[in-house]
Amino acid sequence: MAAPPAPQPPSLLGYHRVLSPLAGIRVSPLCLGTMHFGGQWTRAMGDVTKETAFALLDRFYEAGGNFIDTANFYQGEGSEKWLGEWVASRGNRDELVLATKYTMSYRLTGPEKIKSNFQGSHSKSLRLSVEASLAKLRTDYIDLLYVHMWDFSTSVEEVMQSLHHLVAAGKVLNIGISDAPAWVVAKCNEYARFHGLTRFCVYQGRWACSYRDFEREILPMCQSEGLALAPWGALGRGQYKSAEEFQQEGTRNMGPQEEKHRLMGAKLTEVGERKGVAAAAIALAYLLHKSPYVFPVIGCRTVEQLEANITSLGVELSDEEIYEIEDTIPFDVGFPMAFLFESPQQKYRSDMTTRHIWQVTCNARIESVPKPRPIEPKQGYKQMDRK
């Protein structure tokens, strides 16, 4: 006798997805970032009290979210400590997918006199950081561990061997990489592939409709290697506002508003008004439409912001609307993609294939298989029938 279907999720956040072709773990379509949590960086990032942080974590969890991101470095280690305290108090560790990172100088305020090995991607830094993260998160395993950045001093061999040993020991389940060149990631995964080691399954980096340099090399590399994408900065780091709003509210003491962000904010607001949602929902929906296996990292400071972000999962954008957003500010994809795909009649788009290369099609009509499409947004709630 077949089992009945699972109950309807409390929100669109509860329709979970496979993380990537290389990692079968199931995660919510949005990842809650906790860089605001910890109480140490209030001058740069604004004040989020522990009470507010726990309320955000509670609402994310109640809405069906299970994918949460932190790092050893955030808030002078305060982010991991608060997250670990919340998880322990709620008793829901195994329901969650916790992601953290190593490489950054996480002991900046520690009592140690010599701190040279409390940073970097090498084996000692990895060991020290992971043991500390496990203690702060109050757990005995990490679902996803990122190399936080490429330090350009540790070899591919050392990084991949050391990470694999942690996976084999059961302390880490999956590995990812952040803020690294595409060629480095490809080289790491090639080494792992040919030596029977664990491969990177997700890439985290800056990507937004006003930060499209990610699309030059990183996006196609991830699509080719089977990596998921966890973009940070999807909301323009708080700059998608009018000049008046920015002047009144500011943005975490991170400098003046850039003109490209003001223009993009106006366009996102315009598209959002047509669809009855906030500009932030359009910014997230844009990324969710660009490629499969995209899990934006959302950094919220209020429950209201979180609720607005969740609505992005029900927003449908046409190709024309995506192009409208992209054409708001210039984007130079650079050589060789511009040379191959652009012409006076054609702008580069990230979904282009062989049939869009004019040197290929100038003497023959060529058809090609489209690039894989992402999961379509859900319009309200849908029954998930089992066959």
Swiss-Prot record:
> From its record, what is one biological process in GO terms?
sterigmatocystin biosynthetic process
**Residues that coordinate or bind substrate:** H148
EC number of this enzyme: 1.1.1.-
Coiled coil, from the record: none
Binding of NADP(+), residues: 69, 178-179, 204, 233-243, 301-309
Gene3D superfamilies documented for this protein: NADP-dependent oxidoreductase domain (3.20.20.100)
Molecular function terms, GO-annotated:
oxidoreductase activity
Q: Copy the pathway line from the protein's UniProt record.
A: Mycotoxin biosynthesis; sterigmatocystin biosynthesis
Name of one Pfam family that matches: Aldo_ket_red
Q: Which residues of this protein are catalytic?
A: Y74 (proton donor)
Listed A to Z, the keywords are: NADP, Oxidoreductase
Q: Which SUPFAM superfamilies match?
A: NAD(P)-linked oxidoreductase
Under what conditions is it induced?
Answer: The genes forming the sterigmatocystin biosynthesis cluster are co-regulated and induced on oatmeal porridge or the fungal isolates were grown either on oatmeal porridge or in YEC medium (0.2% yeast extract, 5.0% corn steep liquor). Expression is positively regulated by the cluster-specific transcription factor aflR that binds the palindromic sequence 5'-TCG(N5)CGA-3'found in the promoter.
Domain of life of the organism in this record? Answer: Eukaryota
PANTHER family of this UniProt entry? Answer: NADH-SPECIFIC METHYLGLYOXAL REDUCTASE-RELATED, NADP-DEPENDENT OXIDOREDUCTASE DOMAIN-CONTAINING PROTEIN-RELATED
Q: Which family does it belong to?
A: Belongs to the aldo/keto reductase family. Aldo/keto reductase 2 subfamily.
What job does this protein perform?
A: Norsolorinic acid reductase; part of the gene cluster that mediates the biosynthesis of sterigmatocystin (ST), a polyketide-derived furanocoumarin which is part of the most toxic and carcinogenic compounds among the known mycotoxins. The first step in the biosynthesis of sterigmatocystin is the production of hexanoate by the fatty acid synthase (FAS) units stcJ and stcK. The polyketide backbone is assembled by the non-reducing polyketide synthase stcA by condensation of the starter hexanoyl-CoA and 7 malonyl-CoA extender units followed by cyclization and release of norsolorinic acid.
Record protein name field: Norsolorinic acid reductase stcV
Q: Name the species this protein comes from.
A: Emericella nidulans (strain FGSC A4 / ATCC 38163 / CBS 112.46 / NRRL 194 / M139) (Aspergillus nidulans)
